[in-house]
A protein has these predicted regions:
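Formylglycine-dependent sulfatase
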Residues: 21, 26-400
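Short acidic, Pro/Gly- and aromatic-enriched capping/linker segments at domain boundaries
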Residues: 4-20
Length: 400
């Protein structure tokens, strides 16, 4: 890849272990430096020479890149929804709020485009990794010449890490014995804590640290990955800061929330239930979110709301009392998951602030990789695996 050339910054005595340099950007990856010492027959006549250590430019910002999963445009309060997302709102109030960002309709393609800066087909992800084919653009392989932002920043001296969902490893390489070339650690991310695939049980996930499977939930009934992931990210940031406070970090934070299965803690379910956000039903909720979005300016003020699709979903007033109870319970679980996830993201950001590094940290918080998911059908399901296997549970069966 070719980038715009920059002035090279150097420090220390040339050829000594203390020497550092920044990259010009003319060529990525940078060519190996030529040996600058002297080699003679005798050690006393020879002169050692160390290649300068590559460091980022002075005042290079830290980067915290956050993306949630299957969260729609009208879900968070930041964009007019009723589910409280104070962390996202805090960033919106002190930064910029984008409402014209585009994603693909699937997890893997959006994520491949995000980490490579390329069209998802160019990065090998025309579909999710589980549906890969042996054709260009659809093989689920990020080629070596499609460097990730992790690889580029690592080569420029950043500490790089990936927390949460990895849906960009080919399904045929998602094994505890590898190969690991297309795992996060093989794509330029020095540290990985998360799961490989489209989703995970948040209580007992198929969890890895780097490429080693771990089981931190064993013997801990209240353990949840949403919290554990934030804990591990905070621990990692503290270690980077303690060992080399001058080293900027790039942290890719991609939780499994709010992709099914929806696994918030009971504490968060109770919090959302007590707010009674959904008691008025989906017709009034839709109108309220629509008006909120116009008020916030995230949709044009003259936008017209489409008629309710009664041929597909009946009006709330036509639902039975038992149906209303079921649907409210479903959405409260989802909302609790969204709010819980936003809270834990806030803890990570607070850790950055506690280090005194918030003002020099670029934070990007993307609300959902592909919008609200249609998985589960129009009336939802208590069993995601059953739905994926073609078993749709009618409302009557769910209420039993």
């Amino acid at each position: 890849a070719v980038a715009t050339a920059k002035a090279i910054e150097t420090t220390g005595t040339p050829g000594s272990p203390s020497a550092t340099t920044t990259l010009s950007g003319k060529q990525l990856p940078a060519p190996d430096p030529k040996f600058g010492g002297v080699i003679k027959d005798g050690a006393l006549q020879s002169k050692a020479w160390w290649a300068p250590r590559i460091v980022p430019p002075k005042q290079a910002p830290n980067i915290l890149l956050i993306m949630t999963d299957d969260s729609g445009f009208g879900v968070p309060s930041t964009f007019g929804g009723v589910i409280p997302t104070p962390t996202m709102e805090r960033l919106a109030k002190t930064g910029l709020r984008y409402n014209n960002i585009h994603s693909t309709a699937l997890c893997s393609p959006t994520r491949a485009a995000l980490i490579t800066g390329r069209n998802h087909h160019s990065a090998g992800f025309g579909v999710i990794s589980e549906q890969a084919t042996g054709f260009p653009g659809y093989n689920s392989i990020i080629a070596k010449d499609k460097a990730t932002i992790g690889r580029i920043l690592l080569d420029n001296g950043f500490a790089t890490s990936w927390f949460g969902k990895d849906h960009n490893t080919p399904a045929f390489e998602a094994s505890a014995i590898g190969p690991f070339g297309h795992w996060p650690t093989g794509l330029g991310f020095e540290y990985f804590y998360g799961f490989v695939g489209g989703d995970a049980n948040q209580w007992e996930p198929n969890l890895f640290r780097n490429t080693t499977q771990i089981y931190p939930f064993q013997g801990k009934p209240g353990w949840n990955l949403v919290t554990a992931m934030a804990d591990d990210a905070i621990d990692y940031l503290n270690r980077v800061n303690q060992i080399d406070p001058s080293k900027p970090f790039f942290l890719h934070y991609v939780p499994g929330a709010t992709h099914a299965p929806h696994h918030p803690t009971k504490e968060w379910v109770d919090k959302i239930h007590n707010l009674h956000l959904f008691d008025d039903g989906w017709n009034k909720l839709r109108e309220r979110i629509f008006e909120n979005q116009k008020r916030l300016g995230v949709i044009p003020a003259n936008t017209q709301l489409e008629p309710w699709p009664t041929k597909v979903i009946k009006n709330w007033e036509d639902c039975t009392a038992e149906e209303k109870k079921l649907f409210i319970k479903q959405v409260e679980i989802f909302a609790a998951y969204e709010a819980y996830n936003d809270y834990e993201i806030g803890r990570v950001i607070q850790a950055v602030e506690d280090m005194g590094k918030l003002d020099n940290t670029l934070i990007i918080y993307i609300n959902g990789d592909n919008g609200t998911s249609a998985e589960g059908g129009l009336t939802g399901t208590p069993n995601e695996v059953a739905w994926f296997n073609g078993v749709s549970l009618p409302v009557e069966a769910q209420m039993k």
